[in-house]
Amino acid sequence: MEFILSLVGSLLLVICVLVSVAFLTLLERKVLGYIQIRKGPNKVGLMGIPQPFCDAIKLFTKEQTYPLLSNYLSYYISPIFSLFLSLFVWMCMPFFVKLYSFNLGGLFFLCCTSLGVYTVMVAGWSSNSNYALLGGLRAVAQTISYEVSLALIGFKILLFSLL
């Protein structure tokens, strides 16, 4: 019974995160519309509320293209794996009801975020383009450099909280 409740809770968490991201993009588009002195995306429904769902339908019905000489499987699997890794990070967040019990939640957070680096590199490599590969390697270098400082700051906070 506890497994079913944690599964339902994690599914509800994932759905809420994805819907909130969709509405944050709607908020961003509205704010940019007001900044540029034009109306934002308010043509669909009441004040543009169904706009994220219309954007999702448009996104899923688009034609899928891929580079001719690319590694097709890893080219499409790496962004999906990156999405799953970013959603796994939400599992270690503390809520009122504990979904999963993590003794080392900070280490799980650092591991999931550091694994996300490799998906960018695999996506750049699998496109079989030198520019995409260089961009992926640049993103890996930037992400590793900020993760080292993030880990050091986190360990320093942990150390000072124990004193």
Curated annotation (Swiss-Prot):
Keyword Transport: yes
Bilayer disposition of the protein: Multi-pass membrane protein
Reactions it catalyzes: a ubiquinone + NADH + 5 H(+)(in) = a ubiquinol + NAD(+) + 4 H(+)(out)
PANTHER family named among the record's database cross-references: NADH DEHYDROGENASE SUBUNIT 1, NADH-UBIQUINONE OXIDOREDUCTASE CHAIN 1
Name of the molecule in the record: NADH-ubiquinone oxidoreductase chain 1
UniProt KW keywords: Electron transport, Membrane, Mitochondrion, Mitochondrion inner membrane, NAD, Respiratory chain, Translocase, Transmembrane, Transmembrane helix, Transport, Ubiquinone
PROSITE patterns per record: COMPLEX1_ND1_1
Domain of life of the organism encoding this protein: Eukaryota
Bilayer-spanning residue ranges: 3-23, 77-97, 104-124, 143-163
Enzyme class: translocase
Cellular component annotations (GO), alphabetically ordered: mitochondrial inner membrane
Keyword Transmembrane: yes
Matches recorded under InterPro entries: NADH_UbQ_OxRdtase_su1/FPO, NADH_UbQ_OxRdtase_su1_CS
Subcellular location(s) of the protein: Mitochondrion inner membrane
EC number: 7.1.1.2
Role according to the record: Core subunit of the mitochondrial membrane respiratory chain NADH dehydrogenase (Complex I) that is believed to belong to the minimal assembly required for catalysis. Complex I functions in the transfer of electrons from NADH to the respiratory chain. The immediate electron acceptor for the enzyme is believed to be ubiquinone.
Family membership: Belongs to the complex I subunit 1 family.
BP GO terms, sorted: aerobic respiration
GO molecular function: NADH dehydrogenase (ubiquinone) activity
